[in-house]
Regions:
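Short hydrophobic beta-strand segments
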Residues: 42-49, 73-80, 155-164
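Active-site/ligand-binding loops adjacent to catalytic centers
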Residues: 14, 18, 96-153, 174-194
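Buried hydrophobic packing segments
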Residues: 64-68, 86-90, 142-152
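Gly/Ser/Thr-rich loops at beta-strand to alpha-helix junctions
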Residues: 4-6, 54, 79-90, 141-144, ...
C-alpha cells in the first residue's frame, strides 16, 4: 500500500476486510508492480499486476462483455482510463463501438489506448470531479469521466461506471501507522522466507 501520513478510506476498508497492510513509499506504479512481483516470488504468493493486466483477465472479460452486449447496438462508450485493461477489453469485445478514454491518474503510454479517443482530466487524482453524477460513483475517479462525457459526448453515449462508493470503514486513520520513510520495507521483509 502506498505509504502516507494517514491511511486512505480505501486502505482502511481493505484492512478492515482482512487485508494485510504493507506500507512503503512508491515512486511510480511501474515500480510498485516490480516490487509486488518480487514480493510474490520471495514469499511464494501469486502475483496479480495492478489493474489486473493479465491475458486471462482480458480473455475472461472479452467473453463476458461479448456475451452480455452482443445483441446491443452501442455506438459510443466512455470510461475512465488508468491501466487501460477495462477499455482495451471492451474494445476487443465490441469491435463496432467507438470508445472514449478519460485518463484520471497517470500519463498514457504509446499503445495503451487501443482505438479509444483520448481525453485527460485536468484535476489531480485526489481532487473530486466538478460535477455530481446522477448515479453512485467515486468522485475522484469515474465522475471525472462522466464530467468529460457531459462536455464532449452525445445523447445516447454509454458510460461504464467502474465502481460506486463503499461503506465508510469503522477503523480510523489514527488506528493505523501508514507513514514510512523512503526505502523502508519492514512490512514486506517480515513476510520473506529465509
Amino acid at each position: 500500500m502506498p505509504a502516507s501520513k494517514e491511511a486512505s478510506e480505501h486502505q482502511l476498508t481493505a484492512i478492515e476486510n482482512g487485508g494485510i497492510p504493507m506500507f512503503t513509499r512508491i515512486p511510480a506504479m511501474p515500480t510498485a508492480n516490480i516490487w509486488a512481483k518480487q514480493f510474490a516470488q520471495k514469499t511464494g504468493a501469486k502475483y496479480l499486476p495492478f489493474g489486473l493486466k493479465h491475458e486471462m483477465v482480458v480473455a475472461g472479460g472479452v467473453r463476458i462483455f461479448y456475451d452480455n452486449f452482443k445483441d446491443t447496438d452501442i455506438e459510443t462508450m466512455w470510461s475512465v482510463f488508468s491501466t487501460g485493461v477495462l477499455s482495451r477489453t471492451l474494445q476487443i469485445a465490441l469491435p463496432k463501438t467507438k470508445f472514449n478514454a478519460v485518463a484520471v491518474a497517470r500519463n498514457i503510454q504509446e499503445g495503451e489506448l487501443g482505438r479509444a479517443k483520448f481525453y485527460s482530466h485536468d484535476r489531480a487524482f485526489l481532487k473530486p470531479s466538478r460535477i455530481q453524477t446522477p448515479f453512485d460513483s467515486i468522485q475522484t475517479y469515474d465522475a471525472k469521466g462522466w464530467e468529460l462525457l457531459k462536455q464532449h459526448g452525445q445523447q445516447g453515449d454509454w458510460f461504464w461506471n467502474v465502481a460506486g462508493n463503499m461503506p465508510k470503514p469503522t477503523i480510523k486513520p489514527s488506528d493505523i501507522d501508514s507513514s514510512r520513510e523512503w526505502g523502508d520495507f519492514k512490512d514486506f521483509e517480515k513476510h520473506y522466507k529465509d
